[in-house]
Amino acid sequence: MERKEIKDSAYLFLGSIGPAFENITLGIGDKLALKAIAGAYRVSEEEVKKRYSRTGDLGDVAFELNQGEEKSLAIDEVFGSLKEIKEASGKGSQEEKTGLLSSILQRASPKEGKYIVRIVLGKLRLGFGDQFLLEAFSIAFTGDKKYVVKIKESYSVCTDIGELAESLAEQGPKALGHFSIKLGRPVRSMLAQRVKTFEELEERIPGKKAAEEKYDGERVQIHKNGEEIKAFSRRLEDITAQYPDVIEAVRKGILAKKIVLDGEIIAYVEGGKANDSTGEFYSFQRLMKRRRKYEVQKYTEICPVAVFFFDILYLEGNSLLKKPYPERRAILEEHVKESEILHLARRIVTDNLEEIEDFFNEALEKRLEGIIIKSMGRNSAYEAGKRSWFWLKWKEEYASGMRETFDLAIIGKYYGRGKRKGSFGALLCAILNGEEQRFETFTKVGTGFTEADAKEIDSLLSEHIISEVPKNVLIKSRMLPDIFVEPSLVIEVLGSEITESPSHTAGQGEGDTGLALRFPRFLRIRHDKGPYDITTLTEVRNLKEGKSI
C-alpha cells in the first residue's frame, strides 16, 4: 500500500475523508442516497424504500441490490469520488452528488457499495473508534503492541489520524515523540481526575496548590495564527462560526501573533458582569443555543458569553506543553488582556484546605460546578489527552456523600406509558469497556427528564435507531430494549451506589454477574462528548472498590 493510500485508509476507517477537526460533511442525506442507489442498480425508488423500511440501513440495501460480479475499487478511486461529492456545490449540486454516488456504486462490489453508502451517510458502524485504530497502527507499523501508549500520546498532539498513520508507516517507532503543536490542528484536552474525599485533595497534591473555578460551559481551544483565528471544542470540532463575538474579542484582546489558549466558554446572566466575583452564570444547556448553523447573530445577542482562559499551550512558535503549570499560568496572564468577553479563570494559590473549602462554596453560590485543584510542582506539565493527577476536580455532587456522576452512552429505549406515551419511558445506558472496545449495559434511566429533555433526546436519537443489537454492544436478553440505538448520544447521570447485578453486563465475570448503577437520575445531555469519551469499566471498578477514578 502506498503512503497516500495509508493516509486515506485511516480516514475511511473512521468514516470520513479527513481529520475530525475539519468538520467534513458530504452533503448527502437518506433521500439523495436512496435516489443514487435506485439509479445505480436500476430499480425503482419505491423498491429501495421498501427494503430500507425492512433493514433500516441503506448500506444493507445497496449490498442486497448489487448482483454484479465481484469487483475491487482502488482506495484512491473511492477517496477521489467522495471528495468530488463533498466539493459539489451551487445550483444543480444535489443532482451532481447523486450522479457521482450512483457512478461509484456501479463500479463497486456488493460489500464495497455497502460501506461507501454508510460512509456517505456518516453511519459507518464498524464497531470501533480511533483508539482501536491506534492499537492496530502499533502492530502494523512497529510490529509490537508495546508502542500503543506512545502512539496514543502522539495522537493527543497530532490529532490528524491520517498524518499520524502516514508518519508511522514511513518511520516506524522513530516517528513517535516528534509531533508538536501545529496551529489550526487542535490538541486533545488535558482532563482532571476525580477524588473521593475533600481530604484526598491534600493527599494527592500536598502543600501549595492552585484552586480554580470550574465552569459549566463548553471547553474551547483557541488558535490564533496572525489574522486567522479558530475555535475548537473538546471533541476537536471546529466551532469558530458559532462564536463570532469570541473570535472578534480574541482579535482585539490577544496581541500575540501565534498562540494557543485553553479555556471554557460560558453563558452569563444578562445585565450582569461575567468577571464579577459575585456574578451568576447559566448552565451548559443554555449555552447550547449557540451551537447552531443559522441565526448565529440573533443568538449571539440572546445568549451572551464569556471565555475564561486557564492555560496556554503554544506561543510564537514554541510549544509550552512541557513547562510546569506555574510558568504557563504566568505566561497566560501576560498575554490575555481581559475585557467584557475575555477573562482569566479566577483562582487562589494556598496550602490551606479551609481556604480552598471557602473558595469552593463561593463557586457554588455563583452556580458554578465546583473547583479544579492544580499542582504547582516542577513536573506539572500539560498532559494532552490524559486524565491527569496534576489536576483534581471537586464538584457539588462529590461533597454531598455517596452521589456520583457518570457519562453514559444510550444504547436502547423502552416505550413510555401515561404522560410519556409517544416517547420513551426509560433509556438503557452503557459504560465503555476500553480493553474490549465494547459498550456494556450499566443502568436503566427513567427519572430526571423534563418534557423538553425527552423531546430533544428523541430527536437526537431518531437518526441512530437500528434494527438489532450493535456488534460492539453487550446486552443480556432480560434487558433487551424495545428500540435499539447505536452508541452516539451521551448523557450525564447521577447515581447513588454501584452494585452487582445479574441483569447488566458491565464488567461481567465468569459468574454471569455484572455491575449496575442504583437510583440513576438524568442530569443533562453531554453534547461535548462522544461515545468513546464516556465513563469506563476501569473507572466504575475503582469507584466500586472505594478508589478514585
From Swiss-Prot:
A Gene Ontology BP annotation from the UniProt entry = lagging strand elongation
- Can you tell me which residues form the catalytic site? K214 (n6-amp-lysine intermediate)
GO MF term set: ATP binding; DNA binding; DNA ligase (ATP) activity; metal ion binding
Q: Any idea of its EC number?
A: 6.5.1.1
The family database entries (InterPro entries) matched by this protein are listed as:
ATP-dep_DNA_ligase, DNA_ligae_ATP-dep_bac/arc, DNA_ligase_ATP-dep, DNA_ligase_ATP-dep_C, DNA_ligase_ATP-dep_cent, DNA_ligase_ATP-dep_CS, DNA_ligase_ATP-dep_N, DNA_ligase_N_sf
Keywords, alphabetical? ATP-binding, Cell cycle, Cell division, DNA damage, DNA recombination, DNA repair, DNA replication, Ligase, Magnesium, Metal-binding, Nucleotide-binding
What general EC class does the enzyme of this chain belong to? ligase
Query: Record-annotated residues binding ATP?
Result: E212, R219, R234, E264, F310, R387, K393
Give cofactor(s), names only.
Answer: Mg(2+)
* Superkingdom to which the source organism belongs: Archaea
What Pfam family does this protein match (any one)? Answer: DNA_ligase_A_M
Q: Which family does it belong to?
A: Belongs to the ATP-dependent DNA ligase family.
Q: Which NCBIfam families match?
A: dnl1
This protein's name: DNA ligase 1
Recorded source organism is Methanosarcina barkeri (strain Fusaro / DSM 804)
